[in-house]
Amino acid sequence: MYGMVNKAIEDLVVKNFGPEKWSAIKEKAGVDVDVFLSNEGYPDKVTYDLVGAASEVLGMSARDILIAFGEHWVLHTARQGYGSMLEANGRTLPEFLLNLPSFHSRVAMIFPDLQPPRFSCTDVKDGEMMLHYHSHRPGLTDFVVGLLQGLGKMFGTPVEIAVAELKSEGADHDVFQVRWSQAAPA
Ligand code: HEM
């Protein structure tokens, strides 16, 4: 994955737990990289090893780390570096989710070697939809939950996410039931 992913994990850890913990996590993961370059590709293993080591060093489950990382990705990483792209993708949570299927094709204009996830929306109703997530990468279901929670916070829209189907349990791909209520008045 592009270095910006590993950089974002570093940012999350350093902001919340300090630079010493980040050094300990890199050492435990056996990752010998001083500075991750956003535009450079790194093996996916580096990212998985960092999450595994963070779980051990911080005494948190990998699930909680991936959820926190998903929220951080939306609320800090994406907002700071790519705010206009986020804004262009929708003015409300449901609008943003309906446009999610084409979102990473715009990201791929900046990151040409991107291997993006694929999303689609079905059963779209007032306040509810099924969001389908396809990826060749295993183990990122909780990252998606965190991303969706982050989007809810970004739009000030209370959101509930329930996992309806899991690839890790034999389904074709992960499916989330996403329910939202009216955005809080600004
Ligand atoms: C401007 C905002 C965003 C940027 C710049 C961005 C960029 C990226 C990049 C660079 C990767 C790594 C993939 C690779 O290197 O091959 C990635 C992965 C991913 N992105 Fe985004 N992304 C953004 C927003 C989002 C949003 C809003 C969602 C969903 C709600 C999302 C879902 C994912 C997922 C699930 C992955 C993990 C890869 C996988 O599942 O295979 N991203 N994204």
Predicted features and spans:
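Long amphipathic alpha-helical segments
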Residues: 21-22, 26-59
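Short terminal or interdomain "cap/linker" segment that borders an active site or interface and mediates
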Residues: 4-5, 114-132, 137, 141, ...
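Amphipathic interaction/junction segments at domain boundaries or subunit interfaces
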Residues: 47-141, 165
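Generic solvent-exposed, charged/amphipathic alpha-helical segments
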Residues: 10, 14, 101, 145-152
